[in-house]
Amino acid sequence: MRTRHGAFLLLARPATERAHTPEQDQYTLPTLTHLDRLEAESLHILREVAAECEKPVMLYSIGKDSAVMLHLAMKAFYPARPPFPLLHVDTGWKFREMIAFRDRKVKELGLELLVHMNEDGVREGVGPFTHGSAYHTDVMKTAALKQALDKYGFDAAFGGARRDEEKSRAKERVISFRSAGHRWDPKRQRPEIWNLYNTRMHKGESLRAFPLSNWTELDIWQYIRREGIELVPLYLAAPRPVVTWNDTLIMVDDDRVPAEIAAKAEVKSVRFRTLGCYPLTGAVESTATTLDDVIQEILLTTTSERQGRAIDKDQTASMEKKKQEGYF
């Protein structure tokens, strides 16, 4: 067909009439599953931050989200190792199984692990039983994290937080900026359009990056099953000594539990949906001993996975206040 200017216009035939050859099948893009898309997004975030920032680090809390994030980091930079170390802020009150798992896993992968503890808090004898969850978290987690970031000069820290976990995390950006004092101002967050991330910082600022922002608890568990990711055994049900303390079912993990509390302990079949300091992490009664059992439980549950975390109950909007002060 010729236009009035003399040029030829080729008219495309309707899709139903277009010729198709078997050779074209090899160029057809594969259909990505829901988990494939989440994985691709996370890999992009990891590579983007690693490329744009001078000295990134990955926060490693030893939990299921950290396990998934570490697995993604190993994929993102394969066959090389991740171009950043792992940082574990040790409060001194983690489950013994967590610490043993951490040391073994890091050794197996051949990664650099930095462990930091707030020595001022240790000298003061700060602990959840003696000082309460709010003060313990502020000194042994928040202050310790800021100390470590300043000590090593990191300008970016990867974290495993997800938006479905808690209200303040739901409104935080994938790339979350911190002031020179590591404070977060939710009113000054930058817009994030599609998958375009602005990592530019003013002098003294730093950022936190959350590759798992758009994942849900169910996504995490389905990905763990698909990828065969190893976890701390505490996530699966087993007979464990537990006692109710401050309306939370906690595990008696060592002899630092006050005698009057430990004396009331009973052995029950329990597991943990989230892990932290053992006196501040509630267990749930469960018979889920396999990944399939856990996934089935999650499909039927009507409560948040963080319902057993004492630090989320300190006061109204406690998590947002902690994040503004520099918490993970």
Swiss-Prot record:
The reaction(s) this protein catalyses: sulfate + ATP + H(+) = adenosine 5'-phosphosulfate + diphosphate
Gene Ontology BP annotations: hydrogen sulfide biosynthetic process; sulfate assimilation
GO molecular function: ATP binding; sulfate adenylyltransferase (ATP) activity
Involved pathway(s): Sulfur metabolism; hydrogen sulfide biosynthesis; sulfite from sulfate: step 1/3
Keywords: ATP-binding, Nucleotide-binding, Nucleotidyltransferase, Transferase
EC number annotated for this UniProt entry: 2.7.7.4
InterPro entries named in the record: PAPS_reduct_dom, Rossmann-like_a/b/a_fold, SO4_adenylTrfase_ssu, Sulfate_adenylyltrnsfr_sub2
Pfam families: PAPS_reduct (PF01507)
Keyword ATP-binding carried by entry: yes
Keyword Transcription regulation annotated: no
Segments for region (Disordered): 309-328
Role according to the record: With CysN forms the ATP sulfurylase (ATPS) that catalyzes the adenylation of sulfate producing adenosine 5'-phosphosulfate (APS) and diphosphate, the first enzymatic step in sulfur assimilation pathway. APS synthesis involves the formation of a high-energy phosphoric-sulfuric acid anhydride bond driven by GTP hydrolysis by CysN coupled to ATP hydrolysis by CysD.
Family indicated by similarity: Belongs to the PAPS reductase family. CysD subfamily.
Quaternary data: Heterodimer composed of CysD, the smaller subunit, and CysN.
Protein name: Sulfate adenylyltransferase subunit 2
Source species of the chain: Hyphomonas neptunium (strain ATCC 15444)
Native organism taxonomy: Bacteria, Pseudomonadati, Pseudomonadota, Alphaproteobacteria, Hyphomonadales
